[in-house]
């Protein structure tokens, strides 16, 4: 019994020491605000004065890197992410992974474009995924415009349609992977920020006005909708059952990005506007059953063809982005020009 008591005492002593060391380690780590400030200092040493405080940040999602063409070629400054302190290198095909500073539209508004983003499924922490957003805040950005490629859950959506987001489901956050988890940094915002109006209404109104102007000048069958984005961790595309669940929960599109950035941007007081490009239609039908008589007699190739209908793939995502590039560029240019 004495030996057991001694062992228990040692265990509690070790647990207390481990907890104390963990707290001490956390206190020694530089805060996100400190790290973002160091990154901004590094960038401003290289930037001309008129680009040092961009008003708008634009995040280019999968297949949408062509948005960088909206930045005036004269005076443009750009760096690969790996050359910027604190920025992770993107490992996703279709994400160039670079920061681009310049001016845009006839108003010559200073902007910064993030061509590609870090994803949670790449193994990055939420802190790393959202670090670029915090850098934007320290730079002085007032408005963030985010784009992504997403799967369409709403049956009214077609591949190539654009969805202006008005709300989201943070599935990863609901199970503990939240970008604001941990000690709150008052330099950015309050401990419990409300998100009931995360997607700025006046910016969404501007988006619709801009879309109508674009359609008048460039007629197209492409439609713009307004809807709810479901954020999932990835990297697998959703199962049929998961798609039905998300649809029943009220989601119109589903993807693996954007929401952590939105949350951190709103926590920091920036206005946000976000668009999803529908790059595939999610499969909501149930998986064919093994005893389905209509499947009897089909060859292995015929069965594979039936099961592959509507299955998402990254190449499809990139191709849809290319096809929608002109409309997305025209929309973004009109919005930025009126900010």
Located regions from the model:
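Glycine-rich beta-alpha junction loops
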Residues: 60-63, 151, 168-169, 226-234, ...
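His/Asp/Glu-rich mid-to-C-terminal helical/loop segments that flank catalytic regions of hydrolases
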Residues: 282-339
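Structural motif
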Residues: 54-57, 109-113, 142-145, 161-163, ...
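Generic non-transmembrane alpha-helical segments
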Residues: 42, 46, 202, 206-218, ...
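A C-terminal functional module that forms or caps the active site or interfaces directly
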Residues: 236-297
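Active-site rim beta-loop-alpha module in soluble metabolic enzymes
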Residues: 194-245
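Metabolite-binding pocket within alpha/beta catalytic cores that recognizes anionic/polar moieties
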Residues: 2-195
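Flexible, glycine/charged-enriched surface loops at secondary-structure junctions
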Residues: 52-54, 216-226, 317-321, 325, ...
